[in-house]
């Protein structure tokens, strides 16, 4: 049967399906017997039979139906001719006696025959067309080119997942050189395209570099402000003073890239879906509405703001607004007033411009990196001053949990593990635990639960609670290992605690990717007492590796970790423990529940491990949810003032 892919949906629906010869003969016999019976009763004159139609006749709209009825015939219509006999099937058969059949029974026979014919023809087959889009990600970082946190992981993986689902995807980010040629950008070539951006009192030229990798167009905006020592956003003295200028250039360049860059021989054009990430890219929806749509450009484009961390909003003094190159009447979209307690002195009016607020106002849809976080940002506690504005846009606010890269985080293939294992064979995990204990200088004890922590050593991650709980935990028969850096005070505490509990505690100051993989695989329990966590990745890695998470029930942690329920049927419910509120008592209670289950209920513990390992946190799953957001965005009209 011809399909919609080759003929178009309408044409495909009008093609008669082919019937196999054997079944056609059986249908012909049934039809021949029915015709013979009706001819005997004289029914053919009133209702001639014909084969059941293969396709329903279309119903005309009411305005196409004739309003006048045709005149009645003056003479009786001539009797309908007797249908010619159908050709014999060539197969011998005994004709049944049809004397006792009524017309109603004949009708039923015809209905059954028609129903069989419909089944044979497979009329249920329908043409399905998937909408593919031109998607433009705008971000301050993307792995493996430049990364400082979870934002880089998302923007390095989600575009690839969308490209694998058939979309044309571009990622626009700065070309960070750190004062010298960065090997991460070695495969990007100069496109010979450059533009001059009118902002900050002049015209600033930027150029474009391009690399095609993993079915994605990676576009790098080049400017001298991206060529300096330090990290992406600052150095040892703090954030760079010209970050507003640096990311204004990025946003302007991202708006121009789909119009001027012929990637693969074709530009992306105007019907794009812009996915802007955090404050660094938040000027893009404002530019689309203020500087492009009024002139007929990007009227068919839409934008989605993805909030990874609401704490960073790109706030600068109000006096910088004219530098952005926006019309004066658009000041209100970015206007921000600090509360009195946050002002520097009594004469400070607290007036500022807020990049992220501009995107919250003008973006067509808003996404947070978990469902729980989408609710938290509308509360006074979690909204960082934008809670009322975000609450007013609840109708376009959704949460989607980030995915993980199962090519990098897979216990059956992980290059950093001494032994591999899977949900069907967990024996390698016990060996990884023993190797980790030996590597860290801890006694090799398979019966002792090994608890781990991986993350920044700061207040947001709940390190202060861990510090308070360690003396109590060390009285129990457990081992505890921590990996991270941050607050110098917490770093010093880790070193001193290791000296006090040589056989039970290890603290690794700093960060090492191989060690983080081995801790994730070797530990039995992962502790995450974060005060807030928009999504969180470590709990996803832990479940992928059969390590049971104990987390504070906030943001993405609450969304992804299902509480263990020992009273469910066969105890088969839950992937960990999520405690709330965030107190030392609640945290210790959850940890002791996990420790008790590990020691005394081995089958329940194995179920926890396997359910976590079977959870679907792939980027493909997240990408399918983003596709739905794109559909919703294109259903509505774009933002205009």
UniProtKB/Swiss-Prot annotation:
Major localization listed first in the record, in broad terms: plastid
Pfam families xrefs: Glyco_transf_5, Glycos_transf_1
Pathway named in the protein's UniProt entry: Glycan biosynthesis; starch biosynthesis
Residues the entry annotates as binding ADP-alpha-D-glucose: 147
GO CC annotations on file: amyloplast; chloroplast
Keywords for the protein's UniProt record, in alphabetical order: Amyloplast, Chloroplast, Glycosyltransferase, Plastid, Starch biosynthesis, Transferase, Transit peptide
Family note: Belongs to the glycosyltransferase 1 family. Bacterial/plant glycogen synthase subfamily.
Protein name: Soluble starch synthase 1, chloroplastic/amyloplastic
